[in-house]
Amino acid sequence: MDYWSTLNRLAKQYARIGPLKSQLTAMKNWQASIAAGVLPAHALPWLGLSTPQIDAALTQPQAQLQELLQLDHLLHNFRRYIAFHDGMWSFVHEDLFATWHRLYGPQRYLEVAAGNGYVSAGLRAQGDKTITTDAHTWTKENVTGRQPLVPVKTATANAALFLYAQQVDAVVMAWSPDKDPNDVRFPHIMQHYFPTNQLFVIGERNGATNSRLFWQEARTVPDRRLFALNRAFGHFDAIHERVYRLQ
């Protein structure tokens, strides 16, 4: 099944569903930005169909529940499609980094596990200096790391700390995989060797990113600015992706 052709066909067939057009437009704009090698400008709206919307659509002639559920499934799985086809896992955008820079001011950042460097690209666009690193272990599985927006140095997350953390004010980790319990060593290294550096982690706590042990050991830093930052981040699917500050 071709994702876009099926989505476009079903969206055209059920065009009377009010929010569908704006959702589809936002999705196409998002992928067009990624294909052009730039960050999307704005957060995505909530993607998917509500139960009342499906019920209303079923009153249309020739409407089929199976098709509506398929349409809803495609909308909900936009993140997965973009991740595996375009190498973007954390759905960051220009508005997020404009708010980030306003709240935290100019800083020097080290991004670890950077993939294609979307976070670094967003920070750089605001005038922040970045050192961008990734272990490049995903390139055989999908396009992550193959088309970086910024130069990316090869280094594991832990190694990058010892190589570059003393040159920056803050460290950012976005969308680290959730299958490796050894990731708990990363915040321990930060706490022991680089306690003065800020640590930002972008992901889903006890969910899609980082190991459960990582989150069990994580020490959050109270920071009211995160409320405004995460409002700017937005929320468009079942993944509750947030920006956290850890010690």
What are these regions (language model features)?
Residues A83-Q107:
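Conserved alpha-helix/loop element of class I SAM-dependent methyltransferases that forms part
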Residues M1-V92, D237:
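N-terminal accessory regions of S-adenosyl-L-methionine
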Residues G105-G115:
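Conserved class I S-adenosyl-L-methionine
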Residues T133-A170:
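S-adenosyl-L-methionine
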Residues V168-D183:
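A short SAM/SAH-binding and catalytic strip from SAM-dependent methyltransferases
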Residues R108, K129, Q198:
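Residues at the starts of beta-strands that form the adenosine-phosphate
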Residues N116-D128:
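Conserved SAM-binding loop of SAM-dependent methyltransferases across substrates and taxa
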Residues P181-Q247:
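C-terminal substrate-binding/active-site "lid" region of AdoMet-derived donor-dependent transferases
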